[in-house]
Amino acid sequence: NIKIAANAIDSSLVSLKVEKPQLWDLENTNLYLAKVSVYDRKTLTDVYDVPFGFRTLKFTHNNGFLLNGKRVQLKGVCMHHDLGALGTAINKSAIERQINILKSFGTNAIRTSHNPPAPELLELADKMGILILDEVFDCWASGKNENDYAVHYSEWHKKDIEALVCRDRNHPSVIMWSLGNEVEEQYHPEKGVVAYLRDIVRLYDSTRPVTFGASYPSKSAINGTELQVDVHGMNYPSGVYGGPDFYETFLNYPGHEHLSGFASESSSTISSRGVYFPKGYQITSYDLKAPSWAS
């Protein structure tokens, strides 16, 4: 029991030991519940339930990603938060339907591109056995559009990182934090922005690795930017922007034996269902079209 005087603020650490916990993994999504009750003398005034799970994770140079000591190949997608015709308002049943469809063709991981996910997605990922790359920003101080997050970056980036990490850190499905996607600052490692943001994340969670999605990963690898994160996120590494041979050379370069990396975005396509009418009048649904950057 922790006693706090009225109108006071206190920070306390309580340690509990769980004997032989049932581990969380993709097949056995064992979850526990921490119940925090607030009393005013003997009157119950508030209850806060915190679901969580026990599991270990590690990214390795030679064996990739390890979940509870076992190698798991990440078969992921970058999924934006909108729900098609339903729009961006969250509908938990629709998210569950999305995850079921993704799992039906072998997906076991989701990158929340390119902003913080809805809490409902993480709740379902915990229960349904999906790994989450939790992404906080699409841009930093250097914006991509006239009225994007860069307008608010200076005032809000610390608060937003704290809010995201503190909100999501008890979800066993979350395996990595992503600082951003294809940010302009990746070309300027001397400014130290990546390391600066990484250290903010570590203030609130030091148990998970930090990454970001590099849009020109061969450049950010050469210039040292990717050495400022724990795991290298490589957008479209195969065939473009450096090619697969570059990454094998980079990850195995003397002194880089500790590094690990993953494809944070790849296999981009513009073929889909139906027939569309762009400037060329038609594009088929037979997977005949793809953008130049796609793997």
Q: Language-model segments: which ranges?
A:
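Secreted/periplasmic carbohydrate-active enzymes, especially glycoside hydrolases
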Residues: 1-124, 128-132, 160, 166, ...
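Substrate-binding/catalytic cleft of secreted carbohydrate-active enzymes
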Residues: 99-102, 109-295
